[in-house]
Amino acid sequence: MLFRSTDAHLIPRTPVIIQVDGRAFHTFTRGFEKPFDPVLMAAMRYTAEYLCKNIQGCVLAYTQSDEINLLLIDYEKLETSPWFDNRVQKLASIAASMATNYFNQIIKTIGRRYHSPNHSYDRALLKGAEFAACAFNLPREEVTNFFNWRQQDAIRNSIQMTGQAYFSQSELDEKCNQKIIEMLLQQKNIDWNKLETYKQRGTCIIRSVHSSFLLNGERITTDTWSTDYDIPYFIGEGRNYIEKYLYPDESSHERIKLAINE
């Protein structure tokens, strides 16, 4: 009998997306603050940062709602190798496990420190959250389109969640997003367009590479990660926000110049 491996490999030297999603989060978040629970949002950001720091080849994360999208490249240097040899099953299962374990740790820490007593909230923390993940290749020219698609989804989610916090489902039935924005402003005096950017369209965890030189002339680089709460729209000029991570050869020369000038 012939047995075949089902552990497929992604294409090397091609961008990889790992998409991490919360499972049944509509149940997990029941009783949380609406429309934007600060503890939940902080836990998602911290989890995204943790994944960035611990997943080989990760250069960017975009998180919105219960979703984290990670961008991995394995061509930054000639000797760069892919995480777990780009084995699809391994990438997805380990990313999901890492997200699940860390999220459940950090949300308890944040929640117990900052959140007011809430029976539903405590029950959710006791049960814990669970994440699933998938991994796939995208051509370089399609990566920004993917992140723009997820950002548009974030905007729709934000408008819908804000509407649901102030109106009944029957009041929102068959209402387009623009109509919901108008209802919020006219009936509740809430201007969705003036919400903080991260509440409208999510946040990114971005990497900065710092170069320095030792006395012997050797150049060393260190990575730092930070949260961008004021991300642009990933269209037009905003496309470069993503694309600069897809073409490291072009941006690395600029980083070296900056380091030398400093």
Report each predicted region and the residues it spans.
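Regulatory and interdomain segments flanking nucleotide-handling catalytic cores
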Residues: M1-E262
